[in-house]
Amino acid sequence: MRLRNCLFATASVFAFGLLLSPASVTAQPAPPALVLAVGGEPETGFDPITGWGSYGNPLFQSTLLKLDTDLNLVGDLATGWTLSADRKTWTLTLREDARLPDGTVLTAEDAAFTYNTARDAGGVVDLTNLHEARATGPYTLEIELKEPEITFTSRLASLGIVPKAAYGPDYARKPIGSGPFQLVEWREGEQLVVEPNPHWYGTKPGFSRVSFVFGSEDAAVSLARTGAAQLVAVPSSLVDETPQGMKSLHVKTVDNRGVMFPMVPDTGAKTGEGYPIGNSVTSDKAIRVALNEALDRQALVDLALSGHGRPAYGPADGLPWDNADANVKGGDSEAARATLAAGGWRDSNGDGVLEKDGRDAAFTLLYPASDSTRQALTLGVVEQAKTIGIRITPQGKSWTEIRTMMHANAVLFGFGSHSPAEMVRLNGSRYAGAGYYNPGYYNNPAVDAAFAKAEAAESFEASLPFWQAAQWDGATGFGSKGDAAWAWLVNLEHSYWVSDCLDTGRQQIQPHGHGFPITRNLEEWRWTCQ
């Protein structure tokens, strides 16, 4: 799901600073409103059916299951759940005390409505394998799949349940659910204000109001430095410059950044919307493999993240379904040059750029212009690629522009999930051209077959060899030893400035930044100063 970091004009920052000046924030032990600047304003609003909360924590809604701090699967709305012997039907018992802010009870009928509506919407939430969800009682639910799907638990733990009676065209702008918070106001591009749901069944929030301020990174930093915000997400390059009265917080993540390559040549094909498909340079395997061989990822960590991160070699480094043998480790320019030479790339005119069949080894790399970390990574890749004769032109664009260009140009994307299902969405042929998933139109039947075997496995543990085979089975795979569909670069640490008085509790290993991951346990946060 694409989320935007809207620009917040200097004048708006100043005006907001007057409302939440250091004097007003520090005049009492706890601020009247907890102010957070964590980015990630959802362009499409707060509707789980269109993708809100797909990386967890829908804030306003409850999910059937959830992942606890240690990433164990536990109940949220569900108090019990079983899977049938044929692994196609989930039966769940729901809690009876889940209520909307107006006191309306949330029932199994609402849950069934949510799943069936998301299936029919055919959007970001992939429920194509769902046959039917049905309420078998006020608080009992059956979810029947067409085929076994071992990763369906990730849907159970991420899809927020919407109330059937309150759901309509304006729901995304006026969300309501049985989650810990309710919407008070959303001024798009500026701020979101929430208050506790008085009927929330979990830990009672420690703050009567929370304001999320949206804006540029510079604006967020200014809010922290003037004392107008109590928690701010900051780029790794700034995190060590902690303002007085705040502390730095580094959270481990599976949030990665990498270069997606268009995998088919330019034949003039276009999407149904008229956007071009294909790139005749990046579709050459030698180009993709050579870049993976050449890139010094630790240098990129040091350059773009000030050392606050680790190299990335695949989409799931260190997770149980990762295949560490699927990828080259990089930093080997000689191997990269040999790969290019074997692929027929030569510098015939001495300009430092390789050619093949009259075409330069040159392409454009897009990145979101509002993201300084992705810009730094892009520029680092550009410089390293020069050393092996590949010319990359960096272009910072809006997400709206990237959407129209991403099937024909390389893009510096970010992903990272607690589920191996994301590997399918990034590399499965059935997702080719499906929004931001597989925009490069990658298609490898052996990879698809491995994914199918993983999903049909009898247990999660039994699925692991198949996830790993999709990356590299000794002959092929989407990893850099195989088709090199991506050049993964870095795994981030999520970095924050946090008020010395704010206790945010234990944090999960966080997924990709979309969906306010730091706020997963927002209801547990407490003000510690007296």
Predicted regions mapped to residue ranges:
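Detector for C-terminal structural segments
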Residues: 28-29, 187-191, 196, 256, ...
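Surface-exposed binding/hinge segments that line
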Residues: 29, 85, 93, 123-166, ...
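N-terminal lobe/hinge region of extracytoplasmic solute-binding protein
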Residues: 35-85, 116, 176
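Aromatic- and charge-enriched surface segment that lines or borders ligand/interaction sites
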Residues: 79-122, 142, 223, 280-283
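Gly/Pro-rich hinge or "lid" segments in bacterial periplasmic/extracellular proteins
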Residues: 154-209, 218-219, 226, 333-338, ...
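Ligand-site clamp/hinge motif
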Residues: 197-244, 391-393
